[in-house]
Amino acid sequence: MKSITGALRAAIGQRAKERPAIEPLPKSRRIDGKVCLVTGANSGLGKAVAIDLAERGGRVLMACRSGHPEAGEDVRRRSGSDAVQMLKVDLADLASVHRLCDELRTTTPRIDIAVLNAGLMPRQASQSKQGFELMFAVHFLANRVLVGRLLEDGLLRPADAGSEAPRIVLVSSETHRGAEPIDFDHLGAFVNYSFKDGLKHYGQSKLTQCTFAQELSRQLNPAGETRVAVHALCPGPINSNIAREAPLLLKPVLAPIMKAFFLSPAKAALPVTYLCCSDAAGERTGLYLHMMREKAPAPEASDPQNGAKLWSASEALLRPHAPGTS
């Protein structure tokens, strides 16, 4: 209960201190014809991002576990765009991620913008299909596989002279700052915990995710240029479905607090849209935004040694689960 109360207090404090330093993009900013992949786009923040990108002229691919086909129909209706398609993926199953990538390879010429948004905080400890801690698997490992395949299959193409850099935007969280250091000796290992410890493990998964974002930026832009723009952000506290796993007794308490003090998904989508569509974000890499303000991520996430260690350790974790291995 203490962790939940602390999280609510922090979220309300974030709203009270909110002073945007970056202006939201005007609706006149267009991305006509750009292919945009958005994970977790069936509700909440992901759905708001999908609507915004579709309104701006993007061809939006909504990669979701559920919400088929009604979420896609709603995005089409609210954006006024028919260039919206739903794709099936379960990010808790690496085989499902590979199936999505196989489908994209045969149906999609390229990905210009990838928004890795899907997230969750389960009521109690859960395992992914391959036996990893669930939040580690969804927030980091699935994204590691997805990005790797998009690059390997030639859908995410690093820019050369005269071409525009594709963008990868990871939706993370300020909870990464208070997380314990990454345990490389037990990376991704399932541990049993209850809901009251969920926020702690959520923060650990987000530290891993932020570390990945910084290392991915270094790996793809080794000479300091921007061939692929890789960014991460915390959108702030959102009135969305991420608290759907809260105990039933808490839901009547949480609902009015979230409605009063948390951001609507549409407002929380503003920094995501900025990183996806602005000229400035396309010319740089490695940005981290907290709502509409640029900040440095936690030192642990920015540390190149941590990044390199995570890269090699996760590569070893994934090897037994590559397609064609038993």
Task: Report residues per predicted region.
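Rossmann-fold NAD(P)H-dependent dehydrogenase/reductase core
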Residues: S3-L8, Q14-R244, L317-S326
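Short interface patches used for recognition in eukaryotic signaling and trafficking proteins
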Residues: G58-V60, Q85, A255, K295-P299
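Juxtamembrane interface at the ends
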Residues: D185, K251-A255
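Generic recognition of well-ordered alpha-helical segments
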Residues: E215, P271-Y274, A313
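Mobile gating loops/cap/lid regions near enzyme active sites that modulate substrate access
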Residues: A246-L248
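Residue-level detector of alpha-helix boundaries and kinks
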Residues: L120, G131, D197, V253, ...
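C-terminal tail/cap regions
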Residues: K2-P20, L250-K251, A280-S326
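C-terminal helical subdomain
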Residues: V97, S205, A232, P256-P297, ...
